[in-house]
A protein has these predicted regions:
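Phosphate-binding site of ATP-dependent enzymes
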Residues: 2-50, 99, 103-118, 126
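A long amphipathic alpha-helix within ATP-dependent nucleotide-binding catalytic cores
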Residues: 7-16, 50-113, 152-153, 158-168
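ATP-dependent carboxylate/phosphate-activation module, predominantly the ATP-grasp catalytic core
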Residues: 28-83, 122-151
Length: 169
């Protein structure tokens, strides 16, 4: 089956396997003239890589939980995004939200937590942006929570999930 699938798709791509600790993203807004850092998204994915939930917490708390290399990455990414989107700036429209998905991981033989600086770039309003904006508008810096996106087949399933989450939190 594998060879037939490769022939049908026309190519194969291989990537290194990472011993992932945590998924997170740096979130930016590309406006008409500037690139603004709007915050972090700390999130969990399920086994298939689908977004499961976002951690609602202050940017400072998220940044404190990440390796110090992230502060350098934030400055570098803002500069790179500014250069990348420069031809689109100073127009009558804005590019909008950009989320750079990253991860912390451990490499073989190294106990230090490392950062993969760009797993994926999303040129859209991601669930991470929604969670970040929800936190910024509704919670205090001392509060924390989780932001779930869960497809529910029916009201009973949704009510059961609500009961489960209420009991857990």
């Amino acid at each position: 089956h594998g060879a037939a699938t490769i022939r049908k798709m026309g190519s194969i791509m291989a990537e290194p396997w990472y011993d992932k600790e945590q998924d997170f993203a740096m979130l930016f807004y590309v406006g008409r003239e500037t690139v603004e850092f709007i915050g972090y998204s700390l999130f969990d994915n399920d086994d298939s890589g689908t977004y499961r939930c976002g951690k609602l917490m202050a940017n400072e708390r998220i940044e404190a939980s990440l390796p110090s290399a992230c502060a350098i990455a934030k400055k570098t990414l803002r500069k790179i995004l500014g250069e990348m989107f420069a031809p689109l700036m100073n127009k009558t429209w804005e590019v909008g939200y950009v989320g750079i998905d990253m991860m912390t991981f451990r490499s073989a033989g190294n106990t230090e937590l490392m950062v993969h600086p760009c797993v994926e770039m999303n040129l859209r309003c991601t669930m991470g942006v929604v969670a970040r904006l929800y936190f910024d508008r509704n919670l205090t810096t001392e509060q924390t929570g989780e932001f779930y996106i869960t497809p529910a087949a029916d009201y009973a399933t949704l009510a059961q999930l609500d009961s489960q989450l209420t009991a857990e939190h």
